[in-house]
Amino acid sequence: DFAVTSSQKCLMASPGLSFAVVGERAWQAVERSPFPKNYLSFEAIRSTLARDRAETPGTTPVSLVLQVREGLRILTEEGLDHVFERHAEMAERVRTGTRALGFGLLGAGIHQRSPTLTALTVPDGVDANAYRVKVRSGGVQIAVGLRSYAGSCVRVGHMGDIRMDDVERTLEVMRSALS
């Protein structure tokens, strides 16, 4: 009933914009909720957008809106079916390639894994934070896990305008960083 994303994900823009789609059942829950909405009120946003001259709830970051528009143009040009297929193929390559390097996959089942990001447990004896720094020195950016996974997990993104040659280069840098 709620779908939420942000500009830096598959839309290929800088961070700073969030997008939410609210379904009918979710609207009913919002309207029934007794909790105060001091920071984010979907009701206030809806009424603002319904005006003859719609307004955003704050200052519009025009440069980010233009980035998102360009990302959407690129996605439309490639075709969503092809984009989804490309992301699934890259996800599978990252997973098979990293398993061969001794990494484990987080998420027990296929339905728990995203086609746009792979979360991995690092091999025994490898500190995720130090490993991320070594990978970065090879020109590739990966992220460490969050909270309790910070020292034992890395995250590899394969979304947006990433291609299979980028995935292969990432795997090569990750392999080199293990030695």
Q: Model-found features: residue ranges?
A:
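Conserved active-site segment immediately N-terminal to the catalytic lysine
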Residues: 1-8
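Active-site C-terminal subdomain of aminotransferase-like
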Residues: 11-96, 100
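Short beta-strand-to-loop capping motifs
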Residues: 22, 120-124, 158
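Small/polar glycine-rich anion-binding or flexible loop at a beta-alpha turn
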Residues: 91, 111-117, 147-155
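A short linear hydrophobic-aromatic micro-motif
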Residues: 103-107, 140-145
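Conserved PLP-binding catalytic core of the aspartate aminotransferase-like
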Residues: 104-135
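Short amphipathic alpha-helices in soluble, non-transmembrane regions
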Residues: 130-138, 170-174
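PLP-dependent enzyme catalytic core of the Aspartate aminotransferase-like
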Residues: 148, 152-179
